[in-house]
């Protein structure tokens, strides 16, 4: 079991968890030592989101890397997918992003990409953790690393997307964007300017403390309100590091990651093509049934975009994602990318005069109820085994009308209890039953 890594990097409350300057320095040195041990190119790329804690954590990380002899190219405040993109383009040994994604501003963390632009697999994470807990290594003969700022690399990312989609995007509707006061602030606007999109920007004034506060992909009431106020045709909401995207239609109705994935799957010829789709354990059953009825291969991965990616590679598919808004298209990148996904959607919506709502899955989706149960310990398979009988009873009552999922969060100290059913009342009833059992047996 991982000591430091969760489902999406390492994160926690700054100063009250492992997210401290000392740890970041050790992490940098650990990765730098592994880079040297494996003979990779001696430089890495680094970026950060807008949190006030980002700079001191970044420089602690840089000091550990430099001590190991690794050069660092700093992109400044940039979305996570841009770091992954640049890591691959410039053949860096690794890419780091100082971010806690959609978490509150008091948290921070780090996401780590391999030289191929993928998040680390479990085995490599274990190697990194072992090095963190080993002695700090200084480069021999004082051949320490250098540090360079290169904040204009964002232009290369924008031009790459324009080369691919410039001839396809001709969207005439009014768009509202919510940058979560995060890493996409100003960058998303520059991207839309390049495509000549008529847009209004909200939550794009970061001050170091307001990232994800009442805005962004985890607080869609903000973008819904903006769509109504501005009579917009489309709303696009990103999270703090812009690897998630949620959209709303002209009626301010939300389309989550599953819905976005379904739209891209329907028009995959515009988006590079795929032979199948990867969702997760959280993907609504309605989408699974839709894919099956249209003879589109569909599989569920574990929750977490790194697991979606693993299954994409394993099965040779190109497009996958999560309900939360991580959407991966291996035709264009190696990780969840809110900016690229937004452009793909604009390319699709440009192909007809239909409103955004017309691209949604027809009919009502299966109803989901999810309740987070706070716990002060890490949930293991032994804990879940204590609830197996209760889960079986709920599943028996649901029959073919729904399903049950109990899942420990990889980023928060909670157990997520999710029930899906054909009515909201039934989903809520069974979810509350299971929450009560969790409290009786685990709390």
Curated annotation (Swiss-Prot):
Cofactor(s), names only, from the UniProt record: Mg(2+)
Catalytic activity, as annotated: alpha-D-glucosamine 1-phosphate = D-glucosamine 6-phosphate
Listed InterPro entries: A-D-PHexomutase_a/b/a-I, A-D-PHexomutase_a/b/a-I/II/III, A-D-PHexomutase_a/b/a-II, A-D-PHexomutase_a/b/a-III, A-D-PHexomutase_C, A-D-PHexomutase_C_sf, Alpha-D-phosphohexomutase_SF, GlmM_bact
GO biological process, one term: peptidoglycan biosynthetic process
Single Gene Ontology MF annotation: phosphomannomutase activity
Phosphoprotein recorded as keyword: yes
Protein name per the record: Phosphoglucosamine mutase
Gene: glmM
